[in-house]
Amino acid sequence: MARQGCFGSYQVISLFTFAIGVNLCLGFTASRIKRAEWDEGPPTVLSDSPWTNTSGSCKGRCFELQEVGPPDCRCDNLCKSYSSCCHDFDELCLKTARGWECTKDRCGEVRNEENACHCSEDCLSRGDCCTNYQVVCKGESHWVDDDCEEIRVPECPAGFVRPPLIIFSVDGFRASYMKKGSKVMPNIEKLRSCGTHAPYMRPVYPTKTFPNLYTLATGLYPESHGIVGNSMYDPVFDATFHLRGREKFNHRWWGGQPLWITATKQGVRAGTFFWSVSIPHERRILTILQWLSLPDNERPSVYAFYSEQPDFSGHKYGPFGPEMTNPLREIDKTVGQLMDGLKQLKLHRCVNVIFVGDHGMEDVTCDRTEFLSNYLTNVDDITLVPGTLGRIRPKIPNNLKYDPKAIIANLTCKKPDQHFKPYMKQHLPKRLHYANNRRIEDLHLLVERRWHVARKPLDVYKKPSGKCFFQGDHGFDNKVNSMQTVFVGYGPTFKYRTKVPPFENIELYNVMCDLLGLKPAPNNGTHGSLNHLLRTNTFRPTLPEEVSRPNYPGIMYLQSDFDLGCTCDDKVEPKNKLEELNKRLHTKGSTEERHLLYGRPAVLYRTSYDILYHTDFESGYSEIFLMPLWTSYTISKQAEVSSIPEHLTNCVRPDVRVSPGFSQNCLAYKNDKQMSYGFLFPPYLSSSPEAKYDAFLVTNMVPMYPAFKRVWTYFQRVLVKKYASERNGVNVISGPIFDYNYNGLRDIEDEIKQYVEGSSIPVPTHYYSIITSCLDFTQPADKCDGPLSVSSFILPHRPDNDESCNSSEDESKWVEELMKMHTARVRDIEHLTGLDFYRKTSRSYSEILTLKTYLHTYESEI
């Protein structure tokens, strides 16, 4: 896994240029490799000055794949963005005469070099036909009118060493647009129905263009690749990156290794990735087709097309406006031109095509705006990155009077109809992976869908009529259904007529590398988790090696060796029962088969821990942390919730298998008035009165804030039983997480910052729980022979429940909603704990990786 930090060992290799509503968009050519840097020194901006010589010519050079350096002028796809084109670029390279299609009267025309594309008899041999030439002039069918066909092996012309990959990316394509079907988008619908598709693909947070396009290219979260927003401030650079500024041309902002650089480094040619908006879509398609016709030693293997639509129209009209139909038709028409062009070149059974979006679109207007001036008196002292999310920093850097915690307090639960929640960034849901970067402000506002946030009314721009400039926007929580986007894979390497579960866009970089036969650079994706998309797999994942093997202690200590300060053993009757209870701890029995349904979790770092068996649960107990790394138990549909006997209330039993020196002591909790304790296995779910004593062992105990204990107790007493009843039994694995540096990775001991007062008991930052059942609820969890279903949570361990504004009410009113907000992937938990789950199962490892990367969003169907 790639390090989830702003400054890792990534190589910053390219200059990313993209802007919405102006004349720039992302673009790279095969040789566009600039200085590799991720430095904090003086900026090295590509200024305008070297590109002043435009006296050369683009004759024979239009959309050349090699970037020409100064002082010569350029004719590549980005020369417009850099104002470096030769003087005749528009005249020679952007021809539009006679349009982009053949008509009957043009068939066999005399070649005219002024035409945008040709319908002459020699156009096929010269590779510059209009894409419908064969259809109109030779009687062939459009690609869309042909039946679906299963392409079992690539059918490529001689000289193609691998199937080329074309990435067709569309901005702001909400997943639900696909419901418009073949009446509006017949070509896209055919790609979907004949190839491999997901009901949606999840973008990364924030669901903005810059972060997501670069995530698609690198497989990294924004906190890892550094592009944390469409605009951002770097306190070390003391510089601001935004759409309309020159700073975005500076290499120092861009981390990671994008696909085209991975390709070039491994000897695979890459074509242009995105395009200046001044270049018409038709010209982009024709250029890609011409590149595909290049000689073998010049032809790239990977290409990309980028469309600014339907994002532009989605902002203007909203996702549900009737005006959205025409932009979608235009995109589909462009897809049809590409596929007809490929068929014309006899490449339609050779090329792999990915049709993919960067994010969705929501119905938003400026009439639904929360103003911070209604909550704060000093809004002029802060800088707010406004809109569908809020990032707050002091207007004056290093202002000693700036107090983010005070601002949080003034923004928390102040109104019953408040449409945002404030967070310190380290308290954001871990699934967002949006904290570990200095460009992410300490104070963050998660905004409710369909709403905006701004400092004050004067910051919101409206038309002179008072109406909004926009009707749609994006950027919200990436689990919200309106933010989901599209994924379709089509071609000889993708499966035929296959629907796959939703996945996150960090996974696509690895797939694209597999399609091109490349070794991926380090990234945040899980390589192999999308193997089920492909007909054949070039990469076969293997189980990670277990680093630390457990100890299996027996009864080694006497009851008298312990002084826990809270024992209740003196209340056990009869007295010889105490010995019997301890003997129970010596027996393994069948607990492993019952409670570790998918094998024992492996520890992937060096430590010492013990396997502790009990009738109702099993634990991996850490001698370092004085608590379990994990506790696993299986609850049947018929399980009953029982009460706790009075004599077991507020007491803990010693565990005679573990040294007193490696056990917690209740005296620590008596000294720390802010801390209480709870149990990883819930005593309420014990199968017998005798088994209940096991649940009160000190080795089942973990530190908990009293406020959090309300959440944990409700989860254990009510929700676990509810899930077991609904799903025909569940297996539950729970444990602590330590992530004080909020980098999304397991803390080492030196990084843990808080302990129960006067003790060596570390205080977790979070607790996790993994709940697994059979996908087919007719099968009980412990007898499942089919696919598995998983729901996972990473619950923040905090001294208050301020995140839930109704936490003063009964837990039934708010705890489950809080848990849904902190839903997570199993992979997130593995990175945060250093554990590896699901190691013993009949399912393939690729299937297990798919399960581990699944996120239960609790959203309605798209």
From Swiss-Prot:
Q: Which residues form the signal peptide?
A: 1-27
Residue span(s) of the pro-peptide: 28-35
Motif Cell attachment site extends across 126-128
Q: How the protein is affected by changing F210A? A: Reduced lysophospholipase activity
What PTM annotation applies here? N-glycosylation, but not furin-cleavage, plays a critical role on secretion and on lysoPLD activity. Secretion requires simultaneous glycosylation on Asn-53 and Asn-410, while probable glycosylation of Asn-410 has a preferential role on lysoPLD activity. Not O-glycosylated. The interdomain disulfide bond between Cys-413 and Cys-805 is essential for catalytic activity.
Which residues does the record list as glycosylated? N53, N410, N524, N806
**Residues that, per the record, bind Zn(2+) 2:** D311, H315, H474
Residue stretches making up the SMB domain? 54-97, 98-142
The text the record gives for the protein's domains is: The nuclease-like domain is most probably catalytically inactive as residues that are essential for catalysis in the DNA/RNA non-specific endonucleases are not conserved. However, it is required for the stability of the protein and the catalytic activity born by the Phosphodiesterase domain.
Family stated for the protein in its record: Belongs to the nucleotide pyrophosphatase/phosphodiesterase family.
Q: What is this protein's record name?
A: Autotaxin
Species this protein is from: Mus musculus (Mouse)
Please state the gene responsible for encoding this protein. Enpp2
